[in-house]
From Swiss-Prot:
Chain residues that bind Mn(2+) 3: 822, 834
Residue sites binding Mn(2+) 2 per the record: 299, 301
UniProt binding sites for Mg(2+) 3: 822, 834
Gene: carB
Protein's name in the database: Carbamoyl phosphate synthase large chain
Organism: Deinococcus deserti (strain DSM 17065 / CIP 109153 / LMG 22923 / VCD115)
Binding site for Mg(2+) 2: 299, 301
Amino acid sequence: MPKRTDLQTILILGSGPIQIGQAAEFDYSGTQALKALRGEGYRVVLVNSNPATIMTDPDLADATYLEPLTPEFVEKIIALEKPDAILPTLGGQTALNLAMELHERGTLEKYGVELIGAGVEAIKKGEDRELFQAAMKKIGVETARGKMVHSMEEAVEYQKEIGLPIVIRPSFTLGGTGGGIAHTYEEFLAITEGGLRDSPVTSVLLEESILGWKEYELEVMRDTADTVIIITSIENFDPMGVHTGDSITVAPAQTLSDVEYQRLRNQSLAIIREIGVATGGSNIQFAVNPDNGRVIVIEMNPRVSRSSALASKATGFPIAKIAALLAVGYHLDELPNDITRVTPASFEPSIDYVVTKIPRFAFEKFPGTSDHLGTQMRSVGEVMAIGRTFKESLQKALRSTESDIRGVYAEMDEAGLRALLYPNPRRIEAVIELLRRGESIDALFDATKIDRWFLEQIKEIIDAEHELLELGPISEWKYEYWREVKRLGFSDARIGEIVGLSELQVRQLRKAARATPVYKTVDTCAAEFEAYTPYHYSTYEWEDEVTGTDKPKVVILGSGPNRIGQGVEFDYATVHAVWALQEAGYETIMVNSNPETVSTDYDTADRLYFEPLTFEDVMNIVDHEKPVGVIVQLGGQTPLKLAKKLADAGAPIIGTSPETIHEAEDRASFNALCERLGLSQPRGKVAETPEQARQLAAELGFPLMARPSYVLGGRAMRTVRSMEELVTYLDEVYAAVEGQPSILLDQFLEGALELDVDTLCDGERAVVAGIMEHVEAAGVHSGDSACVLPPVNLSAELLARVKADTERLALELGVRGLMNVQWAVKDGTAYILEANPRASRTVPFVSKAVNHPLAKSAARIAVGHTLEQIGLTETPEAAMYSVKEVHLPFLKFKGVSPILGPEMKSTGESMGIDADPYLAFYRAQLGAKSYLPLSGTALLLGDGLDEVASTLQGAGLNVIREQDGNTLPDLLIDVTGSPLLRTALERGVPIVSTREAAVWTSKAIAAAQGSELRVRSLQDWQTQEAVAG
């Protein structure tokens, strides 16, 4: 059936700030849906509080609301925009829960808005554990034995019946939040209590343990004609007990027989029909008992999910785009497959390669928390690799994670390695090293329950390592040898380690033997039809499937896996660069390994290489494509680290030169440059060794800010207040950071106000694009501080000085593109802290706040355009106050105190916009899920809060200065760092831990008291006159 014509305006709900369990995959799916629906002529309205996304760019939707994802704000948008329908299946759990709240409040009925994609009943059946179990029973699909309970009394009663271990799964939560596996009665009580609290409907499912079973997922799509297709099967390398988001996964499933696969397929078809997902995609998870083949369904997500993004990238089938079109009435057989152009979307994808996904973790950011993986997701990003075999795919995925830690494991004894066989991020490395040492597959299977087939495959890689030494001198290897070795996924660097040569020596010998990769195409049909979308991966075979063109080409390096400190903001910058260069007439080539992102969509760049971001893999592409330029400064630290090596090998790096990058990143040369320019710096020195650091600290005095060269996200950065603290810090930093980094010791400017300045420079002229004032004082990482643009608390004279000095610095360095500079203002003097001649994480926020696409301009500068040609010759004036606030993942890391410091810990951000800076701050807080109360009790702990107390009392809150028994307040402001902060966080009470944020919070509450908080689209804001600033 053709698309519905009774719908004119469709409201899409986004997913809000990036958080663990809900990351960049929803920017990718939302962006696809926006393009698809607008392409069909619908008016599309988007609400999403996350400015770091492509989907919230003003030209993607007809009206974009950077507003909190709360029922109150969305109702105001519905009243204003009068949508005919809401599509809630593309914004993760946040959007589904919000749709249900709007239904329950009567908002949908009041305004006559229809839910499309998934109806209320389907969402309830898919998400409510009790209803799901009943539905499965009805169609004869087995679920784990279990019971839904709504109180501790019920839970204790049922636990007696089912025993231990026991799985606790709260209803309607994200990424397994609040759940877990209890092995002891004490754990059972603690997890269940937390789960009941975290579930918005106060219910948890208690289930029999299926630890150690094999886990599979099927990605399923259905249309209103009841055509159901399977996009792909996905197998979890890690057995049951590890959240699928934290597990290594493989597509297609490797260890299922055809009969077993058909059984899961048939059950999936029955499940999606019974749940009632009439249109769109669902992800269905199964567990299979390896001993007897018993199959149970674990759960389904009646929406586009993290696995959908992986399945899309693994197969080339655009699940989110097709889901959006099915939601407006199309049938699968009416939609063409973009890649083949001859097959309809009702053809199930078929693939002739293997895809491996490996998650990326950030436990090093949260010392003291356990790295034991369970049913609560804790990874912050992921990589994907494609190979012709599992072995090739696994080795490529391992090197894509950028955590080259082979040496660490080689030095461990066997007892230490065996101690790492519990579910944790390092288990795969321990398994590999133990196999290297001769551990048996049976012993490893007993310890890990990782399927023997996977262990056999890894053992074959290890056997090949031994065989390499028997092939004779590497200089005499024939092409056939090289081909067989490389088809197992071995990198030049790893071959070099084994045979005792450098990576560059191996590369030269390999090229001399004419052993270079060919590039295959991801085509959805296992090469049965011609593919029109150039989406490629490398392997070592005969036939190359890349067809060249005569257009000048530019390679843009992506940012690899998301992590704390290098998130979706850098993907945003690389996508903008692609668009700008396409407009300028270049053929764009994207290289990236992250399946969650817009940059790795098959129709973003002219050509996509899904490859690891390593010197070897990137240089192979440069050799193959012969581009006129390679852009490294938009993808964060990952491509920057490759810049010098690529340039030395002949890659034409364009934009800011590797020499400039080095001059700004290397602390000693940067300090000398600032002295030459007469820029004030905190007193500081660079130490090359721990001994020198101790000596310099004694000269400078404490407190000091200590930071290593070449790090992102404040990695290993700390405020040290005594020699003892410094000694401990040095021991830790030399253990945690690769190589022997030089360390900058700076006088710490206690209580200074920090500024972030983003600048564009074309080599002849520099223009500051935006100056952000931090809410938090110096000492809190810039990525964890809220910030406001334009600044509120600084004089015009000081801002003019900062602007002029920043522009002088950019010109002196020879920046060609973007530069971010951080300043600290104390007693009327601005001190320069650091300069980064690259895109910073504030680029998307500033681009929206000042209505200028900074990353697009940086890309145009890289290919020779001037700021004058671009049309940016002076600092743009902001039409509104914009506040960026961060989302912090403390809840996922038990026992960690939610206190901010110089090491970055946030995973995402929200944006608030208003004509009043304090109302913009209030909106940003709500957008980051910190729901500041406008009434009730505020508990203030610590000195220096009298002004805050007075403001809150004036706003009508009851202010108390000590805790009333065990009763928690409605707002906790605690600058003493007490354990109450953690307790309040776990109970959902908004917390503030610094005096600076407390001042802003109190003023925001007072401002919100007397305001209607009207909603206004970003497009509308950007057309008005500038605010003062």
